[in-house]
Amino acid sequence: MALTQPDLGVLRRAQRGDARAFTTIVRAYERPVFNYVLRLVGDRSLAEDLTQEVFLRVYQGLPRFSARSRFTTWLFQVTKNRVLDELRAIERRPRAVVCLDDIAPLEAVDQPVERAETIDAVWRAVEALTVDLKMALLLRDVVGLSYTEIADSLEITLATVKWRIYKAREEVAAALQRDGVAVPVVARAASTT
């Protein structure tokens, strides 16, 4: 599931301050940004706040956005920077327990119990990843960005993106195996676009 780019006319109008055009952009990207942030921070309320802050920063920075890069690349770069700022601030505060059990797993509604348990186990394994691995994996598998877009968004090389996604998937698979969770192997195309 790749994210589409906003219509250039809508983007240009939003850059000139057209509130309707900006609302169109927010509606198109609010859910993917929120889902990404939620999986990184593990707290629905904080994810909602951060998503709003991301779009405030996007609104403020939109007049300076140039079409040299894709809008989604820039949007997730803004998102990454805001989340990293928040994670650094959280590190300086007394520790609080983040529990993935409070987060409804994607696609778990109306699924058999075993499938829901497997999804929960996957998200627990993802939650245990380092922030760098988690960001790359979520941008690819949840948001649907290409490897190139991830490299641009995270400001890292394409090789680093490939390694982080490979390593993240390897660590998730190892965690699932340790927990005795059987997950069917799905052949993945070697697409790096």
Where are these regions (language model features)?
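Short amphipathic alpha helix immediately N-terminal
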Residues: V26, A128-Y147, S153
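Short, charged helix-capping/linker segments at alpha-helix termini
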Residues: L3, R13-T24, F34-E53, L158
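Internal acidic/polar
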Residues: L3-D7, D85, R93-I119, S146, ...
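DNA-recognition helix of helix-turn-helix
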Residues: K80, L84, R88, L133, ...
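Structural recognition of an alpha-helix C-terminal capping motif at a helix-to-coil junction
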Residues: N35, D49-L56, S69-N81
